């Protein structure tokens, strides 16, 4: 970008992104631009949503795992359930991300039905926010965003993740 041509980026202390899946090529390109302008930060991924005061997960320093949005922030709990249920899926399997903790909203203003669908009391007695986002979790507890349920494409009876299509496009 012409705006950054003469910029001194040595002042950057951190840089993070959490909008959607971050392709490795974009991460590397960003870090290269920062390095050429005197900076040394790594671009780390995180995850958040409005219903949970935005930032809920982040990648700890020097713990980069390609495709991961990190681990839950302190005082937050996360688990993966089979979509439409409260049943936890095995580690490594995909399912809907649920969150519990002090950052989770109390409900939607004047929308009790939507609140009841989104905030559910599970068998452990805690209120869990059903995010509508599909994730998987590694053995080490790192979470991997797959897609927003509302963005899933159905093609010939198969579920296709937009990120799969985007990954192919990024290679070309």
Per-segment meaning from a language model:
Residues 7-10, 92, 129:
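Structured loop/turn residues at beta-strand edges in well-structured enzyme cores
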Residues 19, 48, 70, 101, ...:
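Active-site glycine-centered loops adjacent to acidic/histidine catalytic or metal-binding residues
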Residues 67-72, 88, 118, 125-127:
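Short Gly/Pro-enriched turn/cap motifs at secondary-structure boundaries
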Residues 101, 106-107, 117, 125-126, ...:
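AMP-binding/adenylate-forming catalytic core of the ANL superfamily
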């Amino acid at each position: 970008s012409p705006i950054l041509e003469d910029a001194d980026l040595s002042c950057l202390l951190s840089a993070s992104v959490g909008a959607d899946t971050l392709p490795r090529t974009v991460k590397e390109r960003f870090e290269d631009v920062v390095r050429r302008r005197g900076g040394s930060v790594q671009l780390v991924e995180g995850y958040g949503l409005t219903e949970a005061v935005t930032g809920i997960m982040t990648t700890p320093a020097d713990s980069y795992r390609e495709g991961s949005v990190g681990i839950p922030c302190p005082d937050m709990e996360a688990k993966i359930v089979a979509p439409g249920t409260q049943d936890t899926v095995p580690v490594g399997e995909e399912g809907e991300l649920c969150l519990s903790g002090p950052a989770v909203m109390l409900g939607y203003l004047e929308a009790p039905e939507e609140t009841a669908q989104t905030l559910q009391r599970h068998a452990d007695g805690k209120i869990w926010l059903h995010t509508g986002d599909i994730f998987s979790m590694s053995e080490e507890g790192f979470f991997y965003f797959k897609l927003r349920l509302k963005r899933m494409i159905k093609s010939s009876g198969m579920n296709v993740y937009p990120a799969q299509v985007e990954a192919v496009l990024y290679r070309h």
